[in-house]
Each structure stands twice: as structure tokens, then as C-alpha cells.
Amino acid sequence: MATERLNQVRTSVFQASQSLLQTLSTSLGPRGLDKMVVKDKKTVVTNDGATILKYLNHHPIHGILSSMSATQDEECGDGTTSVVILAGCLLESISSLLERNVHPSVICDNLEIAKKIGLRYIDRVKMECSEKDLISNVTTALCSKIASSTGEMAVEAIRGMEYVNGDKKNIRVVKKIGGNLDDVKAYKSILLECDLKDIPKKAKVGVIQFCLSAPKTNMDSKILINDPALMEKIIQDERKYILEMCKKIKKSGCTLLVVQKSILRESLSDLASHFLKQLNILVVNSVDRKDVDYICSAMNIQPVSEVDLLSPASLVDVETGEVEGMLEIKGYGCTILLRGCDDMVVEEAERSLNDALCVVKCLKELPFLVPGGGSIEMGIALMLSESTEGNIYVLREIAKAFEGVPYFLARNAGLYPVEIVSELRSELKQNCCAGISVRSGHAGDMVRDDSVVQPAKVSISVVTLALETVSMILKIDDILPARR
């Protein structure tokens, strides 16, 4: 009975992983196709593995593979589809081993050996990365994305990372509808939406987290007015209350006010806006909490929660200007402005930009690159098939799984996959930089001829995550429903 249940669970796991492999395999590589995902009346068009998996949770195994892809996305930005395809191919090979009564413990031990062999191979073929190689790396990461036709995003991503000394968290992305993807640009400044009339060249910036509007009663409270004269008095009191707040802001010396968005009431009333305009104070209204945190971090100031706490000490002197119809605070942080014809294009462009930024970050942390075009996976497959370290039979099955990545890469490019994989296998024995060239339709030198390279950290992460995740899945013997 227990054996029957175990077989049912394993069959379910392998079938779920194979369905996911079939879905994602067509999105691999520069000629990979996009997926249209529809959920809750929201439509997303993307070929990013992590984004697709975010919407697919039909089986518990999908959640595990989704977490693996999300980790790859967070660590490296690139390789989110490759890691899932490699894991799927490994599970397919392992299922045939289990059918031949190979014990899971033996397979897990050999997966660990395969990981060591794979990392050793990457260490052997990696090359030092120079500043000139940055463009090639970022372009390779973007070749399957919506921004593949333009080199502007790669250039601006590198420029943006230079502005913040390689710290991706200090880059803010602003999306605007209109224009095209070529209009992407990195600014060494903070860009904010506001009324652009009479922008001063210099300003004193203050950030507030309180509302400039009349105070509200509690949700269940009511105000009953019996005398019409009291209505006028309430209006005058509200006017006086807001005017006093505006005068205190003016007294502090603030000339540019950033107001955080409120979910309870309007952050800036029409009356407050009128008074501040009369006092020559420029207002940036309804700024999101995360943007307020970014502004404060970039400018090294503290947001003020009460009007009485606003003082000259809480302000910062800045130079301002106008860029693309937005207020520019010069010299602080970094903003990358993305443009596109509609929301769907801009969202996908943002995901592409994130990949580009992560690739630059990877190369700053580990300045080594490896050839692309399935070269690493095929090279590891050759090493495993020739290795005598573990169980030769198991290692050869794992080697077949690694050949899956160049196979799907060739198939998606419209080539004959079996023929190309065989050609790549023979080429790699003579040249460790050989890979599948989508341009020529044959195996060629990825570094010299095609300039298709990727950070070594991406390949290290793909191999490590895929093998460790498969090893964990292999140890599952039952799926238990949890209490809701």
C-alpha cells in the first residue's frame, strides 16, 4: 500500500514537472516565444521564466520550481527559464532511473557529485571580464526580451549602475506611457511628477508624512449642526487650521514640499494647495511610501510626521530642473526613465531592465564570464559522461539532462536539434568556447565570432539551484493536505 502511494506521488510530481517543462521550453533563448498569462482579468505577456511561474500554481511542485526561479531572478536576474528547464530535464532522466529500481539515495549522491563536476568545469572555462565585455553580457541577457532590438537599454543600465557604484537598490525606475523603448535614459537625479509652473533653479526640500487637509472624524462619528451660523464657523476654522500649517511650512524655509500619499484622507486639499502656491512653495503630492523612502535615503534626510517638527535642519538645498515633463532634483540617486506604447509593453520593459541591471551587478560581484549558446551545459554533459567519480550509469543519465538545454535552444531557433547538439558535442572537444550560434545555424565560437557571453555567476547559480532542488524533490515520498 505504501509503495503504491509512493509511486502515485512520484508519478504526480514527474507529470507536473514535465507539463511545466513543455510549457517553458519554447521560451528559451533569443528565438524563444512569449506566453500570454491571464489571471483575475489581468493579462501579462512575457517570456521571463520567473514571471510565468508566478502565475502557475496548479500543483505543489510548481510552487517549489517557482521559488527556485524567483531565487535565480533575485540573485542573477538572468537564467530564470534555463534553471527550470534544467530541473525539468533532470527530473525526466531521474524518473527513468527510478523505474529501473535505482535507489533515490544513490541518485542524490550522484547529483552532488554532478554539482561538483559542473562547478569545476565552469571554473576551468571562465574568463576575466573587462569593462568592454559589459555590453556583450547585458546584450546577451536582453536578446530574448522585448528590448532585444535596441542597444539603448544595455547602455543605460550600465550607466545607471555606474551612477550608484553598483548598488542596484539605489536605482529608481519611472514608467511613462508614450514614446518607444529606444527612449530609455538614466539620470543621476530624482524625477518626480508635479505641476511644472515656475520651477525654481534652487530649492530647499522637505519631506512630510502628514496630511495638509482638514482633520476628519472617526469612521463611526457624526457631526450634527442645528444652527446655520455654525456651518460658516466650521468652514472658517478649517481654513484657519490649514493656513496655520502652511505658514509654519513657509517659516521653516521650505520651497519644495514632498507629500506622502495617505490612504485615510486626501494628502493635500485644494485649499492647502492654493495657500502653498500663494506662498511660492512647489508641491509634489501623493508620493508613494516606497518613493518617499527612496528620496529620504538618496538625500540623507528624515521625513517629518508633524508640522511643528519641520525646521531648517530637516531641509536639504538642491538644484532643480525639468526633464521629460517631470521635476528633476539633480545630483541625488539615479532614476531610469522607461517609455512604451502601453502598460503591457512598459511592464515587460521593466522586467528586461531588471535583468540587465542584475547582470551588471553579477559582474561587479564576480568579474568572470563564460560562453553562452548552451556551451556550459553541453560541456558539463561531456564531463559527466566521461567521469568515473560516482555511479557511471547515473551520471550518464544526468549528462543527458544537461544536453536538454542546448537541444531546446536549437529547436526554438528553427534548427535541427539532434544534428546541432551532435555538432556541438564534437566542437566542444576541440574548443571550450563552442556553442550554438543562432545567427549562423551551426556550432561556433561564442566568444570570438558571436560575442555571446554571460556572467559566470549566472551559470554557477543555474547548476547549483537545479541540482539541489531536484535532490530535494527526489526525497519527497508523500503530499499531505494542510489544515486551512
Curated annotation (Swiss-Prot):
Described purpose of this protein according to its UniProt entry: Molecular chaperone; assists the folding of proteins upon ATP hydrolysis.
Gene3D superfamilies given in the database record: GroEL, GroEL-like equatorial domain, TCP-1-like chaperonin intermediate domain
Keywords: ATP-binding, Chaperone, Cytoplasm, Nucleotide-binding
Keyword ATP-binding: yes
InterPro entries xref list: Chaperone_TCP-1 (IPR017998), Cpn60/GroEL/TCP-1 (IPR002423), GroEL-like_apical_dom_sf (IPR027409), GROEL-like_equatorial_sf (IPR027413), TCP-1-like_intermed_sf (IPR027410)
Provenance organism: Encephalitozoon cuniculi (strain GB-M1) (Microsporidian parasite)
Complexes and interactors: Component of the T-complex protein 1 (TCP1) complex.
Lineage of source species: Eukaryota, Fungi, Fungi incertae sedis, Microsporidia, Unikaryonidae
Major localization listed first in the record, in broad terms: cytoplasm
Recorded family membership: Belongs to the TCP-1 chaperonin family.
Localization terms from the record: Cytoplasm
Name assigned to this protein: T-complex protein 1 subunit delta
Origin: domain of life: Eukaryota
Keyword Cytoplasm: yes
GO terms for cellular component: cytoplasm
Pfam families registered for this protein in UniProt: Cpn60_TCP1 (PF00118)
GO molecular function, one term: ATP binding
